[in-house]
Amino acid sequence: DSIPVLVLCTVNAKPDLGKGRGRLHEISDQRTAIAPLTAFSRTVMDANEMAQALADAFAAFETQRPRPVVLEYPLDVLAAPADIGHPKRERAARPQAKPADIDAAVKLIDGAERPLLIVGGGTVDCADQARAFLDKSGALAITTTAGKGVIPASHPANIGSSLLSKATQKYLAEADVVIAAGTEMAETDSWVDRLDIPGKLIRIDLDAFTLARDYPPAVGLLADAGRILAELTARIRGGRKPVTARAAEIR
């Protein structure tokens, strides 16, 4: 669910790692077992590296899709003295979408007749930007389960958190431009193997893997959803009236 969680845990002492000696709570490779659930997992093998490992974890929270980070400390490292000092923490910026890709997205949105906005969990911290884009673009909106509440249920252009609905899926197939912001469009939102999206798809996501997975976009914008939605809102022509009667019909 894109939640930043810092997990600090112990592992057997360095001489015992991977030896299968039957130590208490021994796992042959704890770091690898945890890795698929995390942004990264790391075994800190030197007490002097502890502070830098923590700094790297918080840098990941700031610049990537928020996900858990696991730092494991061998018992002998945890007990060792360390000259920590001040860790080096780079203030890396989040990814920035290419200007040419933003231009292409603006052109598609301005030329759309039936635009549709899908907002996911990656927009929960930029609800104002999502609503401003919706209002100016004249699109209808669908929220995923994780994005529920970003667009108020009372908003006349909000179809709702209803990708399970056949009526919603039908409208998704009718949309000529679909803007998917901060969403994986995962199976658990629709319970279909693959949604039918014949229109031009614009994806906005902070995670490069998610951006290209399952639904390759006509335009992929690798960036923070709030920043991109704000820029698109500033640049699109607007003036299109949302088909709120259709949204009410689908609801």
What is the role of each PLM region?
Residues D1-A245, E249:
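N-terminal alpha/beta PP-like core and its mobile active-site loop of ThDP/TPP-dependent enzymes
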